[in-house]
Amino acid sequence: MAIATPTSAAPTPAPAGFTGTLTDKLREQFAEGLDGQTLRPDFTMEQPVHRYTAADHATWRTLYDRQEALLPGRACDEFLQGLSTLGMSREGVPSFDRLNETLMRATGWQIVAVPGLVPDEVFFEHLANRRFPASWWMRRPDQLDYLQEPDGFHDIFGHVPLLINPVFADYMQAYGQGGLKAARLGALDMLARLYWYTVEFGLIRTPAGLRIYGAGIVSSKSESVYALDSASPNRIGFDVHRIMRTRYRIDTFQKTYFVIDSFEQLFDATRPDFTPLYEALGTLPTFGAGDVVDGDAVLNAGTREGWADTADI
């Protein structure tokens, strides 16, 4: 989803009719000639494999090697199995077409290349039709540990392996379908929180202990350690009502992680019609990202050490 904020208000060489969030990376691509002929109405484009540089492939290898060494025993088995099934490797930025051959056979999903963040309704439309929009470009070598918007490593390494799992794949499609409805009902803030605390930063309980499944964690060296090992954050049992009222942080480690018991639990949470829930929750105050409230199934209350004081989203 579109979570980054627009950059400066300088003139932008965007194609006529462009309605997306103008981030630095999009401005850069428009300035380099990305136009309405290259960029389709649904914001997709051909993966420009000819534009990957040696530095791009080296960055992929560096990031891949770090996570490959770190994630066994931290990432959930379903993620690791998906990574193996897709045949993703350290060799360089993968071909989306090659990954799609395996992905389509497994769950009917496909990756579509996009230049960056896309408008919410476009994003939901893709998910509802089992298409995952992935940024084609790679972060710079000086951005290995943080960048403002998701790049190809975050989107492909972080998100795509779980799309091999049938239950998670169904959840993502249901989320897209729900997003289209939420947009009409003015409830995108609540649904965005569900995405953030599950797809991006979710943990899962397993017989071997807590494991990571959120893409924002599995694609990050430092948060892969922090999410499981640090005493600072809260870890709270999954509750869709609670999550939809909980604000979040985009610029630092999470103050709270929500823990599911299974992907089936996650999928089942999307089955009901959310319309009455939106109406009920819309009248209630939101919670801060680090709040622990009555009724929480608290696995551990964080020490709050190192928490930033600036505002949540």
UniProtKB/Swiss-Prot annotation:
Its cofactor is Fe(2+). Coiled coil: none annotated. Keywords: Iron, Metal-binding, Monooxygenase, Oxidoreductase, Phenylalanine catabolism. Pathway: Amino-acid degradation; L-phenylalanine degradation; acetoacetate and fumarate from L-phenylalanine: step 1/6. It comes from the Bacteria. CDD domains: pro_PheOH. The keyword Iron applies. It catalyses: (6R)-L-erythro-5,6,7,8-tetrahydrobiopterin + L-phenylalanine + O2 = (4aS,6R)-4a-hydroxy-L-erythro-5,6,7,8-tetrahydrobiopterin + L-tyrosine. Its EC number is 1.14.16.1. One of its GO terms (molecular function) is phenylalanine 4-monooxygenase activity. PROSITE patterns: BH4_AAA_HYDROXYL_1, BH4_AAA_HYDROXYL_2. It is an enzyme of class 1 (oxidoreductase). One of its GO terms (biological process) is L-phenylalanine catabolic process. Binds 1 Fe(2+) ion. Fe cation binds at residues 154, 159, 200. Belongs to the biopterin-dependent aromatic amino acid hydroxylase family. This is Phenylalanine-4-hydroxylase. It comes from Ralstonia nicotianae (strain ATCC BAA-1114 / GMI1000).
